Amino acid sequence: MGILFTRMFSSVFGNKEARILVLGLDNAGKTTILYRLQMGEVVSTIPTIGFNVETVQYNNIKFQVWDLGGQTSIRPYWRCYFPNTQAVIYVVDSSDTDRIGVAKEEFHAILEEEELKGAVVLIFANKQDLPGALDDAAVTEALELHKIKSRQWAIFKTCAVKGEGLFEGLDWLSNTLKSGSG
């Protein structure tokens, strides 16, 4: 009964819950982004072995955010977390031009997953503060985002340690999910 009341209350007052996966190669800044969004500050992080999960309340949406480790050995396990996902935040280290091709391959593999067909995609072109970082247009080209025709997506330049661009991306994501597109 309590769950039914909670769902009715949420639907009347516009609250929504969404399951979000934060994916990307190792050292892209996924965990820094998660805790910047949740706590509003930068926390010291170590490479994620497995996952971190936190709730982020934003713009009348309760995001259940799953930050999955990005090491090569962990990536095959990402698919275990795909069911019931409304959105993917794909984080790219814009300064790691040596691995942008690998980031593209992993990204397009994710897009092909049947269990993520209905998920909207938010790309964070992270680490914009570092020398040689690709801007959002260059990351768009490198990831071949123009090939995405069957789902809504957006890309935002971000700097997780400074908090730049993150909430603009979350605004887009929450508005997209509220409009029922996600």
UniProtKB/Swiss-Prot annotation:
N-myristoyl glycine-type lipidated residues: 2
Listed SMART domains: ARF, SAR
Localization terms from the record: Golgi apparatus
Enzyme Commission number: 3.6.5.2
PROSITE patterns linked to this entry: ARF
Pfam families xrefs: Arf
Single annotated GO MF: GTPase activity
Stored CDD domains: Arl1 (cd04151)
Disulfide bonds: none
Positions annotated to bind GTP: 24-31, 67-71, 126-129
Cellular component GO terms, alphabetical: Golgi apparatus
SUPFAM superfamilies tied to this protein: P-loop containing nucleoside triphosphate hydrolases
Family note: Belongs to the small GTPase superfamily. Arf family.
Protein role: GTP-binding protein involved in protein trafficking; may modulate vesicle budding and uncoating within the Golgi apparatus.
Name of the protein described by the UniProt record: ADP-ribosylation factor 1
Originating organism: Brassica rapa subsp. pekinensis (Chinese cabbage)
